[in-house]
Amino acid sequence: MPITDPELVAIFEKRVLNKKVCRRCGALNPMSATKCRRCRSKNLRPKKKK
């Protein structure tokens, strides 16, 4: 059942998709992060979106 309400889609994207993933340990970090919260690596990438 897909979400059709644009307001709910925006909330979903903000809460689930707008993250950075550490390439070293796989931890999820906020988009504003420059270093990983778990291992302090600077090797971060944006989470892939379908």
Curated annotation (Swiss-Prot):
Query: Which GO biological process entries does UniProt record here?
Result: translation
UniProt keywords, alphabetically: Ribonucleoprotein, Ribosomal protein
Q: Name one Pfam family in it.
A: Ribosomal_L40e
A single Gene Ontology CC term = ribonucleoprotein complex
Q: Name one GO molecular function term.
A: structural constituent of ribosome
Q: Which InterPro entries match?
A: Ribosomal_eL40_arc, Ribosomal_eL40_dom, Ribosomal_eL40_sf, Ribosomal_zn-bd
What family is this protein classified in? Belongs to the eukaryotic ribosomal protein eL40 family.
The name on file for this protein is Large ribosomal subunit protein eL40
